C-alpha cells in the first residue's frame, strides 16, 4: 500500500490506495452494463430509427423529384411535337383551302365565261335572225311596191 | 506564525482524510462510495425519467438525452472509427458520464455542509482510487479491443513503423493509465483545494469565478478522459497497412 502523510493527516493521505480501487472498477463496469441497457440501447434505437426515417424520406423525395423532372422533360417534348404537328396541320389546311378556293374560282370563272359565250352566241344568232327577217320583210315590201307600180301602169 | 496557522487551517480542510469502512480485512474510503452512489443514483433516475416514454418526436428530457447520446456517439466514432465504435460506445459514454457527473456533482453540491466523523464528502474523482480504477479499465479495454479485433497481430502495433519503437510503446502502456489517472485526480483535487482555500480565506464573491473555472475544468476533464480512452481503443483496433 502506498500511503504517506499529507498536511498532517493521521492516517491515509492523498495517495492511500486500498480496496476502494477494485470495488470502484467493478462499480463502473456494472454502471456500463446498466447504462447500456437503460440509456445507450433505447436511445440509440430511437435515434437511429429516426435517422433511417429521415434518410429514407430524403431518398424518396429525391427519387420523386427526378421522376418529376423526367416527366416534365417528357411533357415538354410532347408539347413541342404537338406544336409542330399543329403548325403542320394548320399550314396543310391553309394550302387545302387555298387550293379549294382557287379551284372554285376557276370553276366559277369558266362557268361565267361559258354562259357569257352562250349569251353572246344567242345574241348574235338572234341579231342575225332579226336581220334576216328584216331583210326578208324589206324584200317583200319592195316586191309589193314593185308589183303595185307595175300594175298601175 | 501566519504560515503555521495556515497549515492548521489547511488541516481544517481535511485534505487526505478518509471515512474508513472496515469490511472484514479490507478497508474502503466510504466517502467516495457515498457520493458516487448519490450521484449515480441521480444520474440513473434522470436517465430513467428521460427514457420512460420514448417518442419519435422527442420532448423535454428525451431531447437532452438524445443530444447526449449523439455527442457520445460522435466522440466514439471520430476516435475509434466507423467499424467498431458501436461496441465501445457504452463504455466510452459511461466513462464520460461517470467522470462528468462526479466532477460536477463534487463542484456543485455543497457537500461540506454534511458533517462526517472523518474526512468529507466530495467529488469521487478527487480520490486516487477512483481515477486509477477508471484508468486501469481503459487499459484493459484497449488491450481487449486490440486482441479481440486483430488477435496476435495486435502486437504488430508495438513495432509498427520500426522495431526501434518497441521500448517506447511498452513504456506507453504504463504511462497511459498513469497520465489518465493522475490528470483527472490532480485537476479535480486541485480545483477542490483552491475553492476550499479561497472560501476559507475570502468567503464572499472571490471564490465564485474560481468555482466557474472549476465547473469548466470538470467538464473538460470528463471530455478529455473519454476522448483519450476512445483514442487508445481506436489506436489498438486501427489496421496498419
Curated annotation (Swiss-Prot), chain B:
GO CC, alphabetical: plasma membrane-derived thylakoid membrane; proton-transporting ATP synthase complex
Membrane-topology annotation of the record: Multi-pass membrane protein
Function, in words: Key component of the proton channel; it plays a direct role in the translocation of protons across the membrane.
InterPro entries tied to this protein: ATP_syn_F0_a_bact/chloroplast, ATP_synth_F0_asu, ATP_synth_F0_asu_AS, F0_ATP_A_sf
Subcellular location: Cellular thylakoid membrane
Natural source organism: Prochlorococcus marinus (strain MIT 9301)
Claim: Thylakoid is one of the keywords in the record: yes
PROSITE patterns given in the database record: ATPASE_A
NCBIfam families xref list: ATP_synt_6_or_A
UniProt keywords, alphabetically: ATP synthesis, CF(0), Hydrogen ion transport, Ion transport, Membrane, Thylakoid, Transmembrane, Transmembrane helix, Transport
A GO molecular-function descriptor: proton-transporting ATP synthase activity, rotational mechanism
Pfam family of the protein (one): ATP-synt_A
Name of the featured protein: ATP synthase subunit a
The protein's assembly and partners: F-type ATPases have 2 components, CF(1) - the catalytic core - and CF(0) - the membrane proton channel. CF(1) has five subunits: alpha(3), beta(3), gamma(1), delta(1), epsilon(1). CF(0) has four main subunits: a, b, b' and c.
UniProt record similarity statement: Belongs to the ATPase A chain family.
Sequence intervals crossing the membrane: 30-50, 91-111, 128-148, 193-213, 214-234
Amino acid at each position: 500500500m502506498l500511503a504517506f502523510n499529507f498536511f498532517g493527516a493521521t492516517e491515509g493521505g492523498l495517495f492511500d490506495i486500498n480496496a476502494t480501487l477494485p470495488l470502484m472498477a467493478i462499480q463502473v463496469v456494472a454502471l456500463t452494463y446498466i447504462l447500456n441497457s437503460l440509456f445507450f440501447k433505447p436511445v440509440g434505437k430511437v435515434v437511429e430509427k429516426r435517422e433511417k426515417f429521415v434518410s429514407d424520406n430524403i431518398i424518396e423525395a429525391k427519387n420523386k423529384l427526378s421522376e418529376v423532372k423526367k416527366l416534365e422533360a417528357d411533357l415538354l417534348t410532347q408539347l413541342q411535337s404537338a406544336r409542330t404537328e399543329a403548325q403542320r396541320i394548320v399550314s396543310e389546311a391553309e394550302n387545302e383551302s387555298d387550293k379549294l378556293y382557287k379551284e372554285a374560282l376557276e370553276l366559277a370563272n369558266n362557268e361565267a365565261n361559258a354562259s357569257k359565250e352562250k349569251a353572246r352566241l344567242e345574241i348574235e344568232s338572234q341579231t342575225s335572225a332579226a336581220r334576216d327577217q328584216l331583210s326578208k320583210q324589206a324584200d317583200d315590201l319592195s316586191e309589193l311596191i314593185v308589183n303595185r307600180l307595175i300594175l298601175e301602169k | 506564525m501566519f504560515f503555521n496557522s495556515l497549515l492548521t487551517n489547511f488541516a481544517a480542510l481535511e485534505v487526505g482524510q478518509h471515512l474508513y469502512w472496515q469490511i472484514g480485512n479490507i478497508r474502503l474510503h466510504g466517502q467516495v462510495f457515498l457520493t458516487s452512489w448519490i450521484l449515480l443514483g441521480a444520474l440513473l433516475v434522470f436517465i430513467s425519467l428521460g427514457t420512460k416514454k420514448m417518442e419519435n418526436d422527442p420532448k423535454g428530457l428525451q431531447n437532452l438525452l438524445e443530444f447526449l447520446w449523439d455527442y457520445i456517439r460522435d466522440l466514439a466514432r471520430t476516435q475509434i472509427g466507423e467499424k467498431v465504435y458501436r461496441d465501445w460506445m457504452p463504455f466510452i459514454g459511461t466513462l464520460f458520464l461517470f467522470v462528468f457527473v462526479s466532477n460536477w456533482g463534487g463542484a456543485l453540491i455543497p457537500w461540506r455542509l454534511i458533517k462526517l466523523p472523518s474526512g468529507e464528502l466530495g467529488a469521487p474523482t478527487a480520490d486516487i482510487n477512483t481515477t486509477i480504477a477508471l484508468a486501469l479499465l481503459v487499459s484493459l479495454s484497449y488491450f481487449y479491443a486490440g486482441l479481440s479485433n486483430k488477435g496476435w497481430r495486435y502486437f504488430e502495433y508495438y513495432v509498427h513503423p520500426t522495431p526501434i519503437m518497441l521500448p517506447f510503446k511498452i513504456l506507453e502502456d504504463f504511462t497511459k493509465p498513469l497520465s489518465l489517472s493522475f490528470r483527472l485526480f490532480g485537476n479535480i483535487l486541485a480545483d477542490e483545494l483552491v475553492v476550499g482555500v479561497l472560501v476559507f480565506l475570502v468567503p464572499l464573491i472571490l471564490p465564485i469565478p474560481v468555482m466557474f473555472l472549476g465547473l469548466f475544468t470538470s467538464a473538460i476533464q470528463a471530455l478529455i478522459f473519454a476522448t483519450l480512452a476512445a483514442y487508445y481503443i481506436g489506436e489498438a483496433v486501427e489496421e496498419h497497412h
